[in-house]
Structures are given as structure tokens and as C-alpha cells.
């Protein structure tokens, strides 16, 4: 399995409703990406203070790399990604992606 972790540094002006709409768009991809197992999202709750300014995020679990790669190319993912970039501080520099085999 692949765990696809995405950490976000939203602009201060990004409203909670916009954040939720972004997460809803990611969750909706489960309906069109076979092998997309699970999505979790929310704010960082770590007390360590080592978040690098990334205060929100989501984690997607895929059956394998092939499914992950299909998700990355899917038009709905591309649209959600563009929405994320518009909502994050510094555009792409406000997004951190980390994938690992689990």
C-alpha cells in the first residue's frame, strides 16, 4: 500500500468552508479511483512545534503505486490540486507531499 500524505499551509484568508470543500473534493475521488482505500484530513494536533508552518493536511491510502499514479492523473485530482494551490500560502511552496510504502 501507498500512504500519500499532503501537508498544507493555508493562507490566513482561507475560510473553513473552503478548506472543507477541498477535503470533500479529495474524498469524492474515492468514487472514481478504484483502489483508493481511505482518506483522512484535519488540522495538525502535534504538541512538538515541529510542523514547519504546515497546520493542516490529509492522508490518502492507495492499494499500490499504480492506483496512486492513476489518482495523480485524474482530472478531478488535478482540479482539486489547482484549488489547493490557490488556497495555500505561496502556492506550491505551501504544499508538502510525502509518499511512503506501508
Question: What are the residue ranges of the model-derived segments?
Answer:
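Short amphipathic alpha-helical segments
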Residues: 14-41, 76-85
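Short, solvent-exposed aromatic-acidic interface loops
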Residues: 75-76, 102
Amino acid at each position: 500500500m501507498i500512504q500519500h500524505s499532503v501537508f498544507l499551509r493555508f493562507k490566513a484568508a482561507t475560510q473553513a468552508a473552503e478548506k472543507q470543500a477541498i477535503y470533500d473534493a479529495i474524498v469524492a475521488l474515492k468514487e472514481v479511483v478504484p483502489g483508493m482505500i481511505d482518506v483522512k484530513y484535519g488540522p495538525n494536533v502535534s504538541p512538538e512545534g515541529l510542523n514547519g508552518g504546515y497546520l493542516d493536511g490529509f492522508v490518502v491510502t492507495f492499494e499500490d503505486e499504480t492506483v496512486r499514479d492513476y489518482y495523480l492523473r485524474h482530472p478531478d485530482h488535478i482540479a482539486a490540486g489547482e484549488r489547493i494551490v490557490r488556497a495555500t500560502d505561496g502556492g506550491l511552496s505551501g504544499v508538502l507531499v510525502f509518499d511512503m510504502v506501508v
